[in-house]
C-alpha cells in the first residue's frame, strides 16, 4: 500500500494503471476459487484499500492541489468520447511505435555517422543471434496446448485493459498521444500493456526458434533505437555547451535581474526556454541564497502575452518555475540570437538594427540561418548590453563540473570578444582581435560577423582593410549588401570617412545599391 501511494504521488501519469489492479487480482485468485461469487468477493476485499488510496489521491489532486500548471478548469471529461480516444491511442503506441523503431535508426534522413551505423548494425546482428539462443535456453518445459490457449487469451485481455487504463489520466487532462517530442512522453504509461500485448502476439508463433528469433530481433532493434536516442541527446548537449561557452565569452558578467529574450528556431528541439533559464542561473549565480532566480530566459513567441506582457519598456515580468521564481522588468533585457553555424549574438539596437533590412526569403540560398528572425525585430529596442554586461571580466569561470573545460578558441571566440569590446567602443581591442583571427586564418560562416571588424578598421583609419573585408563579406552573402551600406553610411555621417565622402561613394558603387540614409 505504501509503494502504491508513493507511485500515485510520484508520477501521476500512472494512476490509470491502478484501475487495472482488479484484473491482476482476478487472474491470481481464479485458479484457487472456482466459485464466481467467491472470486468477486475476494477481489473486492483485496482491492478495497487500493481503491481508497486512489480516491483519496484523486480528491487531493483535483480539489486541494492548486499550485500546478494544469488547473482543474482545464479538465474535461466526455463519457461519449473517452472510449474513442482510448482505443485510438492503442495503434499509435503499439504498431506506430514499432514502425518508428524499424524506420528510424537507419533512415538516410537521420544523418548518423558511419561509425555509429556500423556499431548499431553490429549490435542488431549479434544481438539477434545471441538473444535468440539465450531465450531458447530459458525454456525448460512445454506448456500444455489447452492450458496455453486459455492463458494466452487472459493475457490478451489484460494487455488491452492495461493500455486502456494507461490512457485515462491523459484523456482527462486532454493530452495528445503522439510519437513526436515532447508529446511522446505521454506514451510512457503504455509500456507495460504494449509489452504484454507483444508477448501475446509472439506466443502465437508455434515454432520456438522462429518465435525467439523474432523476439531477439525486436529487442535488438529497441537497443539500437536507444543508442540512436542517446546520440541525439549527446549531440544536443554538445550544442548546448557551445551555446554556453559563446555566451560566457560574450557576456562574462550579467547584472542580476536581467531577462534574456531569444527565439525558438529549432536549434534545441528537446529543450525549452525553462531549461536555459536554469543553465544561465547555474553559470552566473553559482551560490544562490534564495529560491528567487537572478536571471531568466524566455522564448518570445512562447511567452509574449503571458509571462512577458508586451514588448514595451517598463512592463513587470514574473515567472513561477515551481521550484523558483523570477521577478524582472522589460527595462532590463538582453536580446540573444543563436543559430549555428553563426556565432551567438547579443543584439544591440545601435549596431544590429540594419541587419533586419535584409530579406528573409527561406528559398534564398544566401540566407539560411545567417539573418535574424523577424520576431526579434520588435524586441530589439529593449536590448541594452551596455548597461547589463560587464565591460571586462576575464576571470569569469563557469562551473567546470557542468560546462566542462573551455574549448579550443576558434573564430567565435574572437568574434564574441570583439563584439564585447565594440559594446564599449574599444575599437583598438576589436582591431587587435581581428588581426589575430584573420592571420590564423579564421573566417566566419556568417558574413554579418565581419561588421564589428569593418567598423573598427574604418574608425582607426584602416579604410583599405575595412573595404577588403566588406568585399569578402558581400561576396559570401550578397543578400546583406544593404546591411553593409547602412554601416558605411553611418560611419560617413559621423565624419569617420573624411569630409568629401569619396570613400563612401566608392563603397556604394561597389555594393551596387544603397538605400538613402
Residues of each region from the PLM?
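Polytopic membrane enzymes that build or remodel cell-surface glycoconjugates and lipids
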Residues: 1-298, 311-316, 322, 327-332, ...
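C-terminal luminal/periplasmic domains and tails of membrane-associated envelope-modifying transferases
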Residues: 251-256, 264-517
Amino acid at each position: 500500500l505504501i509503494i502504491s501511494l508513493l507511485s500515485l504521488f510520484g508520477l501521476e501519469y500512472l494512476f490509470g494503471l491502478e484501475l487495472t489492479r482488479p484484473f491482476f487480482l482476478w487472474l491470481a485468485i481464479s485458479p484457487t476459487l472456482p466459485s464466481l461469487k467467491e472470486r468477486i468477493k475476494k477481489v473486492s476485499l483485496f482491492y478495497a484499500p487500493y481503491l481508497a488510496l486512489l480516491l483519496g489521491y484523486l480528491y487531493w489532486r483535483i480539489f486541494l492541489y492548486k499550485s500546478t500548471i494544469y488547473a482543474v478548469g482545464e479538465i474535461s471529461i466526455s463519457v461519449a468520447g473517452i472510449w474513442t480516444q482510448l482505443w485510438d491511442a492503442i495503434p499509435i503506441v503499439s504498431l506506430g511505435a514499432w514502425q518508428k523503431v524499424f524506420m528510424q535508426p537507419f533512415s538516410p534522413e537521420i544523418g548518423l555517422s558511419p561509425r555509429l551505423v556500423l556499431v548499431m548494425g553490429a549490435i542488431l546482428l549479434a544481438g539477434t543471434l545471441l538473444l535468440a539462443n539465450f531465450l531458447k535456453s530459458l525454456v525448460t518445459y512445454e506448456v500444455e496446448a489447452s492450458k496455453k490457449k486459455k492463458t494466452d487469451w487472459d493475457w490478451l485481455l489484460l494487455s488491452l485493459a492495461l493500455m486502456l487504463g494507461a490512457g485515462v489520466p491523459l484523456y482527462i487532462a486532454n493530452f495528445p498521444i503522439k510519437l513526436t517530442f515532447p508529446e511522446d512522453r505521454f506514451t510512457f504509461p503504455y509500456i507495460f500493456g504494449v509489452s504484454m500485448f507483444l508477448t501475446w502476439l509472439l506466443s502465437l508463433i508455434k515454432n520456438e526458434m522462429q518465435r525467439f528469433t523474432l523476439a531477439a530481433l525486436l529487442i535488438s532493434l529497441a537497443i539500437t533505437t536507444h543508442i540512436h536516442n542517446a546520440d541525439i541527446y549527446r549531440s544536443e548537449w554538445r550544442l548546448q555547451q557551445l551555446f554556453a561557452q559563446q555566451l560566457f565569452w560574450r557576456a562574462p558578467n550579467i547584472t542580476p535581474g536581467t531577462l534574456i529574450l531569444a527565439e525558438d528556431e529549432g536549434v534545441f528541439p528537446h529543450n525549452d526556454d525553462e531549461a536555459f533559464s536554469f543553465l544561465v542561473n547555474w553559470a552566473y549565480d553559482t551560490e544562490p541564497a534564495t529560491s528567487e532566480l537572478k536571471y531568466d530566459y524566455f522564448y518570445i513567441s512562447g511567452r509574449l502575452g503571458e509571462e512577458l506582457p508586451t514588448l514595451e519598456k517598463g512592463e513587470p515580468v514574473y515567472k513561477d518555475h515551481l521550484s523558483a521564481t523570477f521577478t524582472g522588468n522589460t527595462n532590463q533585457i538582453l536580446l540573444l540570437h543563436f543559430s549555428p553555424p553563426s556565432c551567438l549574438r547579443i543584439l544591440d539596437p545601435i549596431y544590429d538594427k540594419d541587419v533586419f533590412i535584409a530579406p528573409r526569403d527561406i528559398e534564398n540560398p544566401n540566407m539560411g540561418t545567417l539573418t535574424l528572425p523577424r520576431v526579434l525585430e520588435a524586441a530589439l529596442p529593449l536590448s541594452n548590453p551596455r548597461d547589463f554586461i560587464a565591460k571586462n571580466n576575464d576571470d569569469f569561470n563557469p562551473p567546470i563540473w557542468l560546462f566542462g573545460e573551455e574549448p579550443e578558441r576558434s573564430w567565435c571566440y574572437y568574434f564574441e570578444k570583439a563584439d564585447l569590446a565594440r559594446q564599449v567602443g574599444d575599437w583598438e581591442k576589436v582591431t587587435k582581435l581581428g588581426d589575430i583571427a584573420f592571420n590564423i586564418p579564421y573566417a566566419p560562416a556568417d558574413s554579418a560577423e565581419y561588421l564589428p571588424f569593418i567598423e573598427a578598421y574604418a574608425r582607426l583609419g584602416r579604410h583599405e582593410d575595412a573595404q577588403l573585408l566588406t568585399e569578402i563579406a558581400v561576396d559570401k552573402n550578397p543578400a546583406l549588401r544593404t546591411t553593409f551600406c547602412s554601416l558605411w553610411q553611418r560611419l560617413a555621417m559621423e565624419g569617420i570617412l573624411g569630409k568629401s565622402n569619396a570613400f563612401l561613394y566608392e563603397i556604394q558603387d561597389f555594393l551596387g545599391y544603397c538605400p538613402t540614409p
